[in-house]
Amino acid sequence: NYSVTYATGTLTVNAKALTVSGVTANNKVYDGLTTSTLNTGTAAFVGVVGADVVTINVASATGTFASANVGTGITVTVAGIAKAGADNANYTITQPTTTANITARGLTVTASNQTKTYGDSALGTSLFTSVGLQNSETIGSVTLTSNSALSTSSNYIVGSSTITPSAAIGGTFTITNYSVTYATGTLTVNAKA
């Protein structure tokens, strides 16, 4: 009863997205940077169909922390994982994410030795040195106190005493990224001529 005409259609086959397993990020000590080192020794694609040949290449894989600051469970975004093999054109790659920790770095703040003459001004807040700051960070000031007794005129007593630093603040550093150790210096007060 019919004269049938058949018309063609189009089949579009999209590449399948592969996920990646076996990639982890190493914890690190704070260095002021977001770069992460990765463990890729067991990296593998998940989702390859049947006997398709698709190999993973992690030679250019990189990891980036979401934040450079100290923290736990910080997201690490992975990039640069590539594919090869006879059937690789049938697939795309979903780059993985993982997490890792950044722990505080040791920072030593040392009071500089000071020599004064009886009647000189106070110790100030800038005579100190530091070891451990990262990425050109700076400390603005440090509280410096002495265990020297004070005379009735509020001048340090002649002799030697300890300068104790504390409360590093300011500058460009963030104190929560460091485990701070304070080391003392020596105050020498000479008699006034």
Pin down the residues of each PLM region:
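Short loop/turn motifs that initiate or flank beta-strands
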Residues: 1-193
